[in-house]
């Protein structure tokens, strides 16, 4: 009986912790934006950009392409103590013809917040730093209902004349909730849709300036709870500066491929002949082409 009550208490605590974390995820970025906004006119180190573009959201296993339009706001600020702060808020409007999720509202959101600082500089090119990332995603056509990733970490950074590289490792909180419509048709019920864990992440990236105006970057990142992988992500970006049109503007091609480990949602052994994953697909790809303009 004591063991049962203890398990119930732990479950209740995790539920309350998740509720407070989701509220924090909403309120913390708002506070950051307000803080940056109050300094925008007083500090030249604050920069605002906005983007406008088109996208294709691909679910390859269903041969699904969802096209649409998107835009975002980018805020970057460097404090007096050389701490770099950034906030990126994305909104996507889909032309949803495939209806992978029959009740999908054709609008979804993505956000990224970061605080970055330097711990030690070994040379003009090589440094050790720290970084705190908060990332979120809501209501994708691939049935991601809510996602939150909060990861402080350490970084090793190389900044050459034409090449850049970074290795990042961190530990933090990972949460992914699947939209309920498709899972219900596969035998899953309320309470089966969310997965939250203390987790670890490792990321590596490399960038090359092909010309003074044309730059490319490749990155790979994984999240793991210590026993199994949670998510893998691969990113590619290519930018072309268009200062001739407006100083600080650029064309940006961005590709993000994400793989999800759905075994964490299994109600029975994944080796059972009757096992059905919570979704009939386990990856998605965002292809985005945008014009970035200073505000």
Where is each model-derived feature located?
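Short glycine/proline- and aromatic-enriched beta-strand/turn motifs that initiate or cap beta-hairpins
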Residues: 42-99, 286, 294
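Sequence/structural signature of outer-membrane beta-barrel proteins
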Residues: 55-61, 90-101, 120-122, 133-145, ...
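Repeated loop/turn-to-beta-strand initiation elements of outer-membrane beta-barrel proteins
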Residues: 48, 80-87, 120-128, 161-169, ...
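Residues that define the transmembrane beta-barrel architecture of outer-membrane proteins
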Residues: 63-71, 105-111, 144-152, 194-202, ...
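Outer-membrane beta-barrel "beta-signal"
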Residues: 236-242, 279-295
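Hydrophobic, aromatic-enriched interface-forming segments
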Residues: 162-207
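Cleavable N-terminal export/targeting peptides
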Residues: 1-49, 294-295
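Hydrophobic alpha-helical segments and helix pairs
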Residues: 112-159
């Amino acid at each position: 009986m004591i063991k049962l009550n203890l398990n119930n208490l732990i479950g209740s605590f995790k539920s309350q912790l998740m509720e407070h974390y989701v509220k924090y995820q909403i309120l913390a970025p708002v506070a950051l934006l307000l803080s940056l906004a109050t300094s925008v006119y007083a500090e030249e180190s604050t920069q605002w950009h906005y983007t406008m573009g088109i996208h294709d959201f691909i679910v390859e296993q269903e041969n699904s392409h969802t096209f649409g339009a998107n835009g975002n706001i980018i805020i970057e600020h460097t404090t007096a103590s050389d701490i770099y702060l950034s906030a990126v808020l994305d909104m996507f409007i889909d032309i949803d013809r495939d209806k992978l999720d029959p009740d999908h509202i054709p609008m979804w959101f993505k956000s990224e917040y970061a605080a970055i600082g330097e711990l030690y500089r070994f040379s003009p090119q090589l440094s050790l730093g720290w970084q705190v990332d908060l990332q979120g995603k809501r209501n994708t056509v691939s049935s991601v209902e809510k996602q939150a990733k909060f990861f402080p970490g350490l970084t090793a950074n190389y900044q050459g004349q034409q090449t850049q590289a970074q290795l990042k490792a961190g530990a933090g909180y990972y949460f992914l909730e699947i939209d309920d419509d498709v899972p219900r048709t596969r035998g899953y019920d309320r309470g089966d849709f969310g997965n939250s864990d203390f987790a670890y992440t490792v990321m590596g990236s490399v960038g090359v300036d092909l010309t003074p105006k044309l730059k490319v970057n490749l990155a790979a990142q994984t999240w793991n709870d210590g026993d199994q992988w949670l998510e893998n992500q691969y990113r590619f970006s290519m930018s072309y500066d268009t200062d001739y049109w407006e100083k600080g503007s650029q064309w940006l091609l961005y590709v993000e491929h994400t793989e999800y480990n759905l075994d964490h949602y299994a109600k029975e052994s994944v080796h059972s002949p009757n096992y059905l994953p919570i979704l009939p697909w386990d990856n998605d790809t965002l292809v985005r082409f945008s014009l970035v303009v200073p505000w």
